Amino acid sequence: FELKYTENHEKVFYDSIHFFDDNLHGIAVGDPTQDCASIILTSDGGNTWNKIPCSKLPKFEENEAFFAASNTNIKTIGSTVWIASGGKKARILKSDDFGDTWQIFESPIIQGEGPQGIYSIDFADKNNGIAIGGDYSKPEENLRNKAITNDGGKTWLIVADGQNPNY
């Protein structure tokens, strides 16, 4: 074991880590320590990691964060990465260039409170994806917790509203 990255801040908490298909580029995401997500990147297989400055990231809303959902809130295909958020807002962060530049897209998934938002995201290809979430304080509810996209995450459509699966 060899320590490759350290960050000292009272709010530091990294939720997920994922490597791209080339096994050189990697990304780890964490809750905001300022008004943006905490995202670190590697391009050398994890030997060195660098935090993206807030000036290069979309601004997060207060109480918007990521869920540590068994590492399923990140998806990569080729050089593209999608990351799902929750809490105050349930949005999708997207980069097409290994995390160098970013866009952020709204979703219709339930949001507004701490336990609400997107927990998991997956894509079959660079256009077709699914997001699932809900409200973990109300595990029996299944409203506004599943959405699909066919344009790479720019727009989302609620599906199977009121049907299982629940959160």
Label each residue range with its predicted role.
Residues F1-H9, Y14-A28:
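A generic, well-ordered mixed alpha/beta core segment in the N-terminal half of proteins
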Residues V12-H18, P115-S120, N166-Y167:
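Repeated scaffold domains used in trafficking and secretory/extracellular systems
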Residues F19, T76, D122-F123:
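Residue-level recognition of a conserved intra-blade site in WD40 beta-propeller repeats
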Residues Q116-I148:
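Oxyanion-binding "anion nests"
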